[in-house]
Amino acid sequence: MKILLIGYGAMNQRVARLAEEKNHEIVGVIVRNSEKHYPYPTFEHISEATEADVAIDFSNPELLLPLLEEDFNLPVVIATTGEKEQIIDKLKALSTDMPVFFSANMSYGVHALTKILEAAVPLLQDFDIELTEAHHNKKVDAPSGTLVKLYDVIESLRETTTPVYDRHETTEKRTQDEIGIHSIRGGTIVGEHDVLFAGTDETIEITHRAQSKDIFANGAISAAEKLVQNKNGYYTFDNL
């Protein structure tokens, strides 16, 4: 498989290393600063990478969104999480002409976490829910795209929900429709996501901890391997 990388930060550097270990080939990268030295050819547009079988994106909305507006026909695996709604809308429009894949988190374990949550929420309607995520001190967005995805699952299964991001000025007791959302940034934490169900005299906690960023890179490569075998359409972990 010949892969075009969109972005060449820490994540796509891992994708490159792991993909080559699996005997895939990196044909080039799309980056904002093409004057910097890279170990692969640099491109400005997806359509320029004529040898590529698939593109894997770990970048940012500023780089990605303009590329998605261009004329190209190449399967794409997208992991950028900022401006999620815009990205998904554009991918769904592109999906009539090519297979596209999107996930806010490329870990299959996190996908499993959402499925566990889908089963737990209906069983625990009387429990309060608090969501917490923790990441390294270089992560710029908060809350994480994964935590937003977990909230979306809860919102779809409860009659009313209200996300609460800050309680330091609150002087009233918690309401049952509140979903507390908390972000921690520090050190080199790869990624932790925790769902706390708090009931009367008991709590249930569901946690996913990433122990290496390789799980995200391998998840993207695995998605790409499957995507190139599929017909045009919009894919997630649910249907790939």
Curated annotation (Swiss-Prot):
GO terms for cellular component: cytosol. One of its GO terms (biological process) is diaminopimelate biosynthetic process. It is an enzyme of class 1 (oxidoreductase). (S)-2,3,4,5-tetrahydrodipicolinate binds at H136, G145, T146. It is found in: Cytoplasm. It comes from the Bacteria. One of its GO terms (molecular function) is 4-hydroxy-tetrahydrodipicolinate reductase. NAD(+) binds at A79, T80, T81, S103, A104, N105, M106. It holds the Pfam family DapB_C. Transmembrane segments: none annotated. InterPro entries: DapB_C (IPR022663), DapB_N (IPR000846), DapB_N_CS (IPR022664), DHDPR_bac (IPR023940), NAD(P)-bd_dom_sf (IPR036291). It catalyses: (S)-2,3,4,5-tetrahydrodipicolinate + NAD(+) + H2O = (2S,4S)-4-hydroxy-2,3,4,5-tetrahydrodipicolinate + NADH + H(+); (S)-2,3,4,5-tetrahydrodipicolinate + NADP(+) + H2O = (2S,4S)-4-hydroxy-2,3,4,5-tetrahydrodipicolinate + NADPH + H(+). The active site is at H135 (proton donor/acceptor), K139 (proton donor). Keywords: Amino-acid biosynthesis, Cytoplasm, Diaminopimelate biosynthesis, Lysine biosynthesis, NAD, NADP, Oxidoreductase. Pathway: Amino-acid biosynthesis; L-lysine biosynthesis via DAP pathway; (S)-tetrahydrodipicolinate from L-aspartate: step 4/4. Its EC number is 1.17.1.8. SUPFAM superfamilies: Glyceraldehyde-3-phosphate dehydrogenase-like, C-terminal domain (SSF55347), NAD(P)-binding Rossmann-fold domains (SSF51735). Catalyzes the conversion of 4-hydroxy-tetrahydrodipicolinate (HTPA) to tetrahydrodipicolinate. NCBIfam families: dapB (TIGR00036). Belongs to the DapB family. This is 4-hydroxy-tetrahydrodipicolinate reductase. It comes from Staphylococcus saprophyticus subsp. saprophyticus (strain ATCC 15305 / DSM 20229 / NCIMB 8711 / NCTC 7292 / S-41). The lineage of its organism: Bacteria, Bacillati, Bacillota, Bacilli, Bacillales.
